[in-house]
From Swiss-Prot:
Annotated source species: Pseudomonas protegens (strain DSM 19095 / LMG 27888 / CFBP 6595 / CHA0)
Subunit and partners: Heterotrimer of HcnA, HcnB and HcnC.
Record key words, sorted: Cell membrane, Lipoprotein, Membrane, Oxidoreductase, Palmitate, Signal, Transmembrane, Transmembrane helix
Transmembrane segments: 46-66
PANTHER family: GLYCINE OXIDASE, SARCOSINE DEHYDROGENASE-RELATED
Chief localisation class: membrane
Molecular function GO terms recorded: glycine dehydrogenase (cyanide-forming) activity
Record-stated family: Belongs to the FAD-dependent glycerol-3-phosphate dehydrogenase family.
Lipidated positions per record (N-palmitoyl cysteine): 19
Described purpose of this protein according to its UniProt entry: A three-component membrane-bound flavoenzyme that catalyzes the formation of hydrogen cyanide, a secondary metabolite, by transfer of electrons to a cyanide-resistant branch of the aerobic respiratory chain. Contributes to suppression of black root rot of tobacco.
Protein name, as recorded: Hydrogen cyanide synthase subunit HcnC
EC code(s) of this entry: 1.4.99.5
Subcellular location: Cell membrane
Amino acid sequence: MIKHYDVVIAGGGVIGASCAYQLSKRKDLKVALIDAKRPGNASRASAGGLWAIGESVGLGCGVIFFRMMSANRKREAQGSAVVVDSSTPHILPQSFFDFALQSNELYPRLHRELMGLHNMDFKFEQTGLKFVIYDEEDRLYAEHIVGCIPHLSDQVRWLDQAALRASEPNVSHEAQGALEFLCDHQVNPFRLTDAYTEGARQNGVDVYFNTNVTGVLHQGNRVSGVKTDVAGLFRCTTLINAAGAWAAELSLQATGIEIPVKPVKGQILLTERMPKLLNGCLTTSDCYMAQKDNGEILIGSTTEDKGFDVTTTYPEINGLVQGAVRCVPELAHVNLKRCWAGLRPGSPDELPILGPMDGVEGYLNACGHFRTGILTSAITGVLLDKLVNEEALPLDITPFLARRFATAPVKKQPEPA
């Protein structure tokens, strides 16, 4: 049986769900959200940080990633392990700052909307983010961050050791202070995806879980639908690729071009519930921590090039544990509830891939968000809704178009409609 929709969204993670929710508010579009429910979606590798500045300047799992990459490059160049110079922070382009900050600003209203209209609470909390400083290397890193973002000086605050202890009494005495980002907050990453999905469903979106897209249909240079393994054929006017770490495969099927999105493994762990231990989100050069509303603390996250592997490994989990205990010694006495791994959709420049592909109609990208999918899901949904409806965009997406990559098309016989 053939199903007919205006929009089919392939991928029901936080990005696809946000797109579905924003499109559903139109009421005049017929929308399908298709998700394979495969293990390893990117939300599983997230602590739910809305760290618009923190992630833009390479903190959170970004600082772990940057230090790993820097060490690897220096080993390749010098043939031996070296100390990474943390005085050169990994700053993303201004276009990403604009993208992330606009998304962050949407969350208070979005939270009220999903709570009020759909009774879905994704636990938005205004916590701030503190980069904990242990030594001179960390301080140099923080100073260079501040030097790179003078236009955001009102959103950062230095905390000396006494101020940090007053704000976070359980932080180690080893910490010399912190750099705090006042507009960076948090949500529950799993509840956020559920909230988008349920809001979309209540607004009339048809949701197909445990369903794989197995092929893409074409009429000339236009995408006209998809084939699935268990739900049959879907005809559509627009296909949105929100397939996360699997987006390259869908792009190849739809356009003949394999966009450069690959899985980046992130291991994370969760503690038992406990009384309030952290007043805000913390990030160090070893890990990040976020205590949720139920008392559990999420500790993350590794950044590994391991393909689609989602197994957990002792050395990496132990490294996160040691980093967390170094920052908050009380955690040495806490039980771990579980650990797991998720797959972030990484792109070569760490920026998302959004919008149309040259020469192909009826197809839009919404993928490649790497470590910032939770943060930027809100603005991505808004942008894709406006792209589908051919309306003016709230920001320029030129830096995020797939054409920035010199990717040659792969010859692939398109499936006819």
